[in-house]
Amino acid sequence: SNPNNPAWICLTESELRTIGELATKYDTIVLEDLAYMGMDFRKELGHPFQAPFQATAARYTDNYVLMISGSKIFSYAGQRIAIAAISDKLRNRFYPALKERYGIGRFAESYALTFLYAASSGASHSAQYALAAMFKAAADGKLDFVGHTREYAHRAHRVKELFERHGFHIVYDKDQDEHVSDGFFFTVGYGSMPSSDLVAALLRYGICAISLTSTGSLQNGVRVCVSQMNREEQYDLLDRRLRDFAQDYARK
């Protein structure tokens, strides 16, 4: 995704290569969250079997588990479902420590029957059939799920412009030397105002966001999500509220 949640940046291809190579060197397993797969709108992703492809550490190591959410990439939010894609080499690997601790030594079985079984309530048959059908339609070029989610980029571009117009700045603004993409989330700050103070101040003007501090960030600011900006009048309303905020705080 871009920006990623809760890092607010996207790892570049060179960074992912480093992670993958180190995972192989030190025999470490990479758990890669691709919940917002394809939502880097700086690139023309989403054309099946055609470059460019989703950036991933899995290109550089066999020690990976990819987590992909149906509710995010397909906007299939009713019956929650996701997949954990394990490399063939890793899924068949036998770990004596897992056998001793859980009674199941092969990684895939231990991961599914010990961790996923305990951490989730499973998935309904209808959701499994639906996800399989959407994967097939996407692979066959019949479902442009990246194109459908591009709406979030349009919303983010408009909302970001409103915040910047009224004196806010983008906190996490670049992936190394490239500007972050417009996507589901972005981050803003207002001068040097602490995160918690900014959350409280915005609430007084009817604007809801979460503190960057709550996500482990050391930067001052808030996270903005554009998922509910789905009516034209909301942009005019946000513009007025941010204008009032800026006018009041410019006097302080």
Residue ranges and their predicted role:
Residues 125-128, 132, 145-164, 170-189:
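Conserved glycine-rich beta-strand-loop-beta hairpin in the small C-terminal domain of fold type I
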Residues 32, 45-71, 83, 222:
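Conserved active-site segment immediately N-terminal to the catalytic lysine
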Residues 27-29, 63-65, 208:
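Proline-centered loop/turn at the N-terminus of a beta-strand
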Residues 60-150:
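Conserved core segment of the aminotransferase class I/II
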Residues 60-61, 200-252:
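PLP-dependent enzyme catalytic core of the Aspartate aminotransferase-like
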Residues 85, 187-189, 225-227:
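Short hydrophobic/aromatic beta-strand micro-patches
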Residues 1-47:
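Active-site phosphate-binding strand-loop segment of PLP-dependent enzymes
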Residues 30-32, 131, 211:
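Hydrophobic residues in well-ordered beta-strands that form the structural core
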